[in-house]
Amino acid sequence: NSYQRVNGLFGNTECHATGTPSSEELALLEPWRGKVPEAVFGPMTVPPRTDGDSSLRANLRKAKALLNAAGWSVSEGKLRNARGEPLVLEYLDSNEGGARVVTPWARNLEKIGVTLVFRPVDFALYQQRLQKFDFDITTLAYQGTHNPGQEYADLFGSKAADIEDSGNVTGIKSPAVDALVDRMTRARSKAELLPACRSLERVIAHSHILIPQWFASTHRIAYNAWRLARPAQMPPYAQGEGWAIDTWWANKP
């Protein structure tokens, strides 16, 4: 497969949380029990799979049940609240290329009465609306890292949520997130850093403020194997182009 599903902020790194919280993670999470989703103390989230029509129907039934429990019901083919207002979401994008991803999603949502409108706008307007948090759904790329730090206070910190043009476009305000980011930035060793990162990832994932999409787990580089040679192993987190320029060599004729 060309792409892999994203699962959490720190997927494909040592900072990624897996399984249930370790004792070190629980020590950081326990003070926030009752203030974060209870699921945080269980297994890490796994994106739902749709291996065919049958699994898609099962997921749609689960979604419909959750919406019904929240007070939404279908009337005249549309999912409506107690006031009779339909659930309409706008997907903001800076170009029309996202339609290939959004259109199938919109069709599936339509089956449970939800209307998803794809709204491509020019980049200037897109940026302006993003800065003012004037959107329902959009796509953002969070840069992968194995050494996260203070930038996460801008991405998910409570103070940043009230500052226009900040990185906290989700608007999350959580004392637990603030404390875990602080713990992460004050870590003096990997043994202190990793539990803080994994605990933060669990809280963000179980808050369901982000819909994980995908990443490419490989670098695609076309080259002449007769003329160029390369090391057998690529170092972790290396950029493909830079690695090729810095370490490949010419084969002898």
Each PLM stretch: what is its role?
Residues 73, 115-117, 136:
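Residue-level detector of anion-binding/catalytic polar loops
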